[in-house]
Amino acid sequence: LNIWKGVVPFIILQLIGLGIVGFYPSLVNYLPARTYLTSNVAPPPMNPKLQYCLQEYKFAIYNNSENEIKNAINDFQKLVPTNLPVDKLDIFEEHFDNALGTFAIVQKLQKTEKEYELFAEDYRDLHFSVRKKQKKIRKIEDKIKKLKSEIRNLDKDDVSNKNKLELKIENYKLEITELTDEIPKTWKSQNKEFEILKKAKNTRTKRYRKNVDEAYDNLDQIALFIKDHEKLKNLSSEINDLKYSLNNKDYENSISIIDNLFEKLSEISGTDEFANKLDDLITVIDNDEIDEQKLSLASSETFILYDQEVSWREDANKNLLPQLMQYNEVIKNNIGLRLQSRLTKEQAKFVARCNSVHRDISLNF
């Protein structure tokens, strides 16, 4: 009796736990998922298993905060300096085009998703019924293959067994015919329409993800360009040495300086265009007969671009980077969410709750 006194409370607790699980089965999935998504080993938001729920999370933000996000994009766009090299201006413009275009893409995707869900309501039962019959047909076809294999292995004189097996095959074929006839005549047209809607939904989803990823990646690039302003400015001594060598027609030393610059530029972001100019310059001077006009043009373009790069980056570091960081705070948890290193606690809880609910994916098969 004394033993039971100690055990009873634990049994009651277990029964309560089972009762909770029975009433809230999603809780069994939610708690481990929340623990995992808030842990140090949590997957990044780019993880494929998180995409459905992250999209739900972001679309709610787009619907509720569209004006706030658009205003932030437009306000930051007004701050973009005018003294930008062409390639940097292209990156800024691409960012703003993608960021502002997000909302139209989302609306189209949501419209397509509604059309898909509406069609799927009536189509689901038909799909399940036909796939069940098709599965039976495949099983029967496998049986027929085995019987045909058995026939091939029989002795030529074993006519009796051969006839029995062929009779079984005929019966199976009749069964297949019956099952095929039970498939509604509308199946092919309905299935074709469903596949069109599914493809449209998947295409728009990919388009949306590509759009926001490119938008935020461009902003990341811009921030990195600005932060690397000191590294680029520190090349000024080599640039002056290059000017001096070119003016004195010391082309061998000029080539050596350019080679050294190439190595350093590989560690500085956003210098591809400048590296191309240096490459053009080295092409001109690495010749037996040097075209002075081409040399003058190539060197002028190279040094102008360097000064332009240093100038806009220094100016942006003082006057644009703080506003860029503020702007980033507005868009990083919606447009830029997929490219963050991890989920916030709020996001992790939402995704864990969303993923804990069973979703029917049978229509994909």
What are these regions (language model features)?
Residues 1-365:
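Alpha-helical transmembrane segments of multi-pass membrane transport proteins
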